[in-house]
């Protein structure tokens, strides 16, 4: 993490010194230097925000605002937002939601959207093909809802796959990439999914792409005499 913070700081100092020394001696060069400083400052801001958020989540200082909502409607809205964002980046997006209209979930809409956004951002970060593709599928798996987010990026090595949700873990591709992240984004995702009583895992093939899966329980009205749905077995690393 100290390296990730120091890298943009070093770049900012270098470009500021260049401006002070008169190296940026044309309007074009000055514009390029200022834009680079701005971008590097944004990188630092994002990293600090991720660190702050993870610290709050890790110490249970994030207040969750759970509400009962339509699974089809909520994930449909998420899909529409992704479609607009990815279309602007030239990424093909495919969405499928086979949930019944009356199926409901108890979620924190803001935090669960963060899960989806973090996963897709991670996909875009390592998209190495000109015809990039992202897919989102929401389906019924009994007492649970399963969300699948896939891409056709560079994929993850088999040796790295078991650890991608670990805090600060970065794959070789991430460490060697100029776009490599802090290793916090997916650990935040895991924490939020688990706070929703769910589970998350991934499959991947190098050169072909990665698919992230997470499951959350459906909302179920149970009487006092009924068996509590909290005793249901949570799907773990099983594809349906």
What are these regions (language model features)?
Residues 39-44:
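Short alpha-helical segment of the dimerization/phosphotransfer core of two-component systems
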Residues 59-64, 104-107:
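Conserved micro-motifs of the catalytic ATP-binding
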Residues 65-83:
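A conserved beta-strand-to-alpha-helix junction within the catalytic ATP-binding
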Residues 123-124:
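Short helix-loop "hinge" at the ATP-lid/N-box region of the Bergerat-fold HATPase_c
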Residues 156-170:
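Short conserved segment of the HATPase_c
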Residues 197-198:
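Conserved glycine-rich
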Residues 230-236:
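Conserved small/polar residues in nucleotide/adenosyl-binding loops
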């Amino acid at each position: 993490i100290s390296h990730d913070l120091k890298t943009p700081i070093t770049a900012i100092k270098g470009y500021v010194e260049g401006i002070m020394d008169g190296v940026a001696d044309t309007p074009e060069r000055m514009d390029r230097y200022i834009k680079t400083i701005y971008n590097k400052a944004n990188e630092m801001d994002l990293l600090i925000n991720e660190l702050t958020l993870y610290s709050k989540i890790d110490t249970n200082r994030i207040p969750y605002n759970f509400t009962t909502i339509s699974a089809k409607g909520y994930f449909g809205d998420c899909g529409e937002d992704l479609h607009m964002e990815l279309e602007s980046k030239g990424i093909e997006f495919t969405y499928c939601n086979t949930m019944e209209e009356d199926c409901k979930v108890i979620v924190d809409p803001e935090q669960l959207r963060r899960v989806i956004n973090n996963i897709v951002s991670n996909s875009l970060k390592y998209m190495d093909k000109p015809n990039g593709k992202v897919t989102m599928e929401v389906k019924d798996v009994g007492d649970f809802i399963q969300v699948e987010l896939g891409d056709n990026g560079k994929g993850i090595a088999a040796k790295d796959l078991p650890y991608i949700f670990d805090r600060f873990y970065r794959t070789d591709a991430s460490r060697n990439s100029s776009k490599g992240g802090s290793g916090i984004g997916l650990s935040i995702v895991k924490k939020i999914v688990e706070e929703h009583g769910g589970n998350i895992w991934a499959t991947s093939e190098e050169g072909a792409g990665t698919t992230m899966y997470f499951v959350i329980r459906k909302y179920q009205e149970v009487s006092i005499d009924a068996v509590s749905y909290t005793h249901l077995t949570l799907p773990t690393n099983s594809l349906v």
